[in-house]
Amino acid sequence: MYLKQTFLMIALGAMAMTAAAQASIDTQRQYLSGHGCDDMVNWDFYCTGGRNAGKWTKIGVPSCWELQGFGTYQYGMRFYGKATPEGIADEKGKYKYEFTLPQEWEGKQIELVFEAVMTDDKVTINGRKAGNGLHQGGFYRFTYDVSDRIFFGKHKNRLEVEVSKESSNSQVNMAERRADYWNFGGIFRPVFIVAKPAENIDRVAIDAKGDGHFMADCYLNRAVKGAKVKTEILDEKGKVVASNVADARNSDEAHVDFQTKAPKLWTAETPHLYTAVFTLQDAAGKTLHRERQKFGFRTIEYRASDGVYINGQKVIFKGVNRHSFRPETGRTLSKAKNIEDVKLIKSMNMNAVRLSHYPADPEFLEA
């Protein structure tokens, strides 16, 4: 019995060590906010104008602050075509939040990611400016490398964000805020920390054709000399159906190019998805970092004076215009609400969506 217990403890310890090692090579994520409107996290908040202004209180993040009882509701259409009109709501929101990070993340590349903020924002972490000090544009993900200004373990980190509802860039205002919809302010999509090994895959661009031809450009950060990228294609059951190894060119990019056999093709009615696993290795084959990305094999063609073909079959688009919006939560949605919209669109026998007039939540695109 004692030998069995000892063996079990050794086996469990080995499994734990293996799991930790696997996690250390994968990209890891820690949310500082909620994932959406259904699980917001309270941050300290101060609004400079409108309702409930002039005092520090709490606000759920992510959210549009108007829907949380702050600032001024304003519809954009009355200001259409006017760069700097009188009467525009221009309050600011100041956010503060403290958090800790795992001690084992020390030495990794640490990125602070905002999915979207309306509209201008200035970010500091532990009293130091993040990035160039100002991000503009309300619908785009932006990322700061904060590896050199972050603490680990029990030492708390302090995040401060100042958000301006109106942009100081008139072109941003004309493009985003002088239109036929509500103008909101706030950190309205999730905020999270990403941890990667110091040598890592920064991003990947995939081009997978309907004939099984798979290509990808892997952009690398601080890749060592002789680095290579191993690519594995997994089917829906997790089985490896194809693999390849590509050398990094100029040490900061690897081009993947190989053929797969008889893949199941993606269409609007049969959206077969595969998973590409990209593994960055050093010259000796040691794994440095691993990324995963879902994709579908498909070929899209436009034939002049004819139409659009997907995988050689002509497609008649039956679509709808869709805003990222709910009257209860503004532009802050959730995975459930995004899936709800997709199911509604499919129930109307539609096969296309116009994402007016800005990038949608990643969860909507993935649905």
How would you describe each model-predicted region?
Residues 1-10:
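Bacterial N-terminal signal peptides that target proteins for export
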Residues 11-20:
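Hydrophobic h-region of N-terminal signal peptides that target proteins for export
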Residues 21-78, 162-171:
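Accessory carbohydrate-binding/adhesion or oligomerization-edge regions at the termini
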Residues 26, 48-49, 90-201, 223, ...:
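Accessory beta-strand-rich segments of carbohydrate-active enzymes
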Residues 27-34, 204-205, 277-347, 366:
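N-terminal carbohydrate-binding accessory modules
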Residues 123-125, 213-248, 254-256, 276:
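Beta-strand-rich binding/interaction modules
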Residues 130-131, 241, 315:
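Short hydrophobic beta-strand segments in globular cytosolic domains
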Residues 195-224:
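Surface beta-strand/loop "capping" patches
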